[in-house]
Amino acid sequence: NGSRTLLVPKPEMTHIVVVGGGAGGLELATTLGNKLGKKGKAAITLVDKSRTHIWKPLLHEIAAGSMDVDQHELEYMAQGHWHGFKFRYGELIGLNRANKQVILAATFYEEGREITPQRALVYDILVIAIGSVSNDFGTPGVKEHAIMLDTQVQAEKFNRRLLNACVRAQAQEGPVRPGQLDVTIIG
């Protein structure tokens, strides 16, 4: 289970924790931060497993390589600073309702070194806004062959695969063979 750090706001303030920094969670944390956090009426914390927000309807542009992500992503920490809420980086891995705690996974650098340990975050009010995921509607072959576009990581993975397939096709002698470079969009 590992060691845990307990993150507790000032005891006299109501602590509202919003898990999920998608469009809904980010909007809620921003609104609550402006109305309550900036005025010292409540402590607002946004939790997300990513450090930045990218508007989900733009993921297809990342996948196609037609958008500069750096120009469109929003740093949660900066948004929190501007709008009166705190940001905690980490993935929700557990919930202790009896003690009013969300359990956040440890976070790591790319090479595996720990950034933050597993920790518990105390709340008075909890909002789970973890969003949605793509539905394959039982379409044959989708689970085995498709890359869903639910996250920036998935969109970037698709873009790399597409570019690599194009490079491979361009480098061969002769024309592209049927089935060598197929792209199908579902949805």
Write out the residue ranges for each language-model feature.
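FAD-binding core/adjacent interface of flavoenzyme oxidoreductases
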Residues: N1, L6-V8, F85-T184
